[in-house]
């Protein structure tokens, strides 16, 4: 399950439990709506509540990153586990955005706002 929020130039996603393909499709739809307004888009991605992800999500993320790598400005990821940070690093290979991993929400939001 995911919780989402959209703002001008920003998509926010919080993952709770297992990240499944239907969740990723929901994120893609929201991203496309925000992108239609103006690019590039910032992404706030909170993975602290994620229990895992399905293989089809991993593949969809690779396809999405290659398709939209240039459409991001900054990607802030909140992660508690080393494997989550590693997965974020893989995303960086195909995204042209600035990407940082944070341990807390405040740091991530400040960075997206340009304060750090």
Residue ranges of each PLM-predicted region?
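Amphipathic, Lys/Arg-enriched alpha-helical "gate/interface" segment within cytosolic domains
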Residues: 1-116
């Amino acid at each position: 399950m995911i919780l989402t929020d959209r703002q001008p130039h920003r998509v926010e996603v919080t993952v709770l439990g297992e990240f499944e393909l239907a969740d990723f499709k929901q994120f893609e739809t929201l991203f496309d709506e925000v992108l239609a307004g103006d690019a590039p888009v910032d992404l706030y991605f909170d993975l602290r509540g994620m229990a895992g992800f399905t293989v089809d999500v991993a593949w969809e993320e690779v396809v999405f990153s290659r398709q939209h790598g240039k459409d991001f400005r900054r990607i802030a990821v909140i992660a508690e586990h080393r494997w989550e940070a590693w997965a974020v690093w893989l995303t960086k290979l195909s995204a042209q955005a600035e990407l940082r991993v944070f341990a807390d929400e405040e740091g991530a939001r400040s960075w997206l706002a340009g304060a750090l």
